[in-house]
């Protein structure tokens, strides 16, 4: 894979992270799996809005979902995603 291609893919990941709602989703998912209904309650966002944010994160391979009956549960795909959020929090002193 060329360096330019890797740089574009890296930029795409950072674009996916570039929204406070998506950061909040990842902060929640680094603790445990959540379904959409739980996230809606905690975050006070509309389902359509939340679904758009989840799809952006999923498209970049940062999260994945698993159907459990009527529920769709989301989780972080790789521990380094949580580590990336933690590094950003350290940079701002949180």
Predicted features and spans:
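Conserved segment of winged-helix/HTH DNA-binding domains
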Residues: 73-94
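Residues within the DNA-recognition helix of helix-turn-helix
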Residues: 53
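Alpha-helical DNA-recognition elements
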Residues: 56
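Short, intrinsically disordered or compositionally biased N-terminal tails of bacterial proteins
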Residues: 1-6
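N-terminal helix-turn-helix DNA-binding core of bacterial DNA-binding proteins
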Residues: 8-48, 61, 68-79
């Amino acid at each position: 894979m060329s360096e330019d291609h890797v740089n574009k893919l890296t930029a795409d990941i950072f674009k996916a992270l570039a929204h406070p709602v998506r950061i909040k989703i990842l902060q929640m998912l680094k603790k445990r799996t959540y379904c959409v209904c739980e996230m809606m309650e905690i975050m006070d966002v509309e389902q359509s809005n939340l679904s758009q944010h989840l799809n952006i994160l999923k498209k970049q391979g940062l999260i994945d979902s698993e159907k459990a009956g009527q529920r769709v549960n989301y989780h972080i795909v790789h521990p380094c995603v949580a580590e990336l959020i933690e590094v950003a929090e350290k940079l701002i002193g949180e």
